[in-house]
From Swiss-Prot:
Pfam families, sorted: DUF1694
Superkingdom in the source lineage: Bacteria
Record-linked InterPro entries: DUF1694, Ribosomal_eL30-like_sf
Protein name: Uncharacterized protein YueI
Length: 132
């Protein structure tokens, strides 16, 4: 085994396997942009009424997972967990204290769906840091 391969092998043993697109994975709560069906900012999740678009995607999309930002308070996303449970969609609370993301909830598919529009672009979104 060459020295470069040995070094790579040792690094992966100590730090884990290499990760593809780490910045993208940090933004989308562990998923990739190509798999995102819908993404809500933290501010949108804090809205008193859940988005109908989120319920529509949870109800009608197949093989998706609801990813929730662990920095949020439970009461802000509990209605989304209830929706996911109602439609048999698994959910994960992602708590990565090392990286911060402006997103609060991501509905992600198991495979690439390549949706062009993944954000609900309302007033709350327009005030967020994601606005282009």
């Amino acid at each position: 085994m060459s020295e470069d391969k040995m070094d790579l092998y040792l690094q992966q043993g100590m730090y884990g396997p290499l990760e593809t697109k780490p910045d993208e994975r940090h933004l989308f709560l562990g998923s990739l942009r190509e798999r995102v069906v819908l993404a809500l900012t933290k501010g949108q999740v804090l809205r008193s009424k859940p988005y109908k678009e989120a319920e529509h995607e949870l109800k009608n999309s197949h093989n998706v997972t609801l990813l929730i930002n662990g920095e949020l308070q439970y009461q802000s996303y509990s209605s989304y967990i209830q929706m996911a449970s109602r439609y048999g969609v698994p959910f994960k609370i992602v708590s990565d204290l090392q990286f911060h993301t402006p997103l609060g909830i991501v509905i992600a598919a198991d495979i690439a769906v390549n949706r062009e529009l993944i954000y609900i672009q309302d007033d709350i979104y327009n005030r967020s840091v994601l606005k282009s």
